[in-house]
Amino acid sequence: MTVKRFIAAPVLGMLILKSLYLQAADTTEHEVRLLIDAIAASHCDFNRNGRQHTAEEAAAHLELKYARAGKRIDSADAFITRLGSSSSFTGKPYLMSCEGDTLPAGEWMIDALEQIRAHTQSLDQSTVSG
């Protein structure tokens, strides 16, 4: 009986940790996909290494970088910092030009991520209360 409890506790703990890890991975994947979709839908110009690209081209580029990075990206914040803010080859920051205003792509994505999280949180709260 004691042996069963001894085995059950670590197994249960591992299952809980795995569940939390999978939830975090699902959240990361979901948030990164929403960020990439937001870029594609933004109609902003994307400056990468001195060259202008459409929003759709920027989204495709970031999608490719994300696919190559794999599990090394453990949060949407890490996606922005490590992949979305600057060129991995030149180190030059990416820029987004939207309606005449230009700002670093990382800043644009942080703002977008805050909006995504606020919207997701309000949906979660309405699901719980409704």
Where do the PLM segments sit?
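Bacterial N-terminal signal peptides that target proteins for export
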Residues: 1-10
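Bacterial N-terminal signal peptides
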Residues: 9-18
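Compact alpha-helical subdomains of small soluble proteins
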Residues: 50-130
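N-terminal secretory signal peptides
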Residues: 24-68
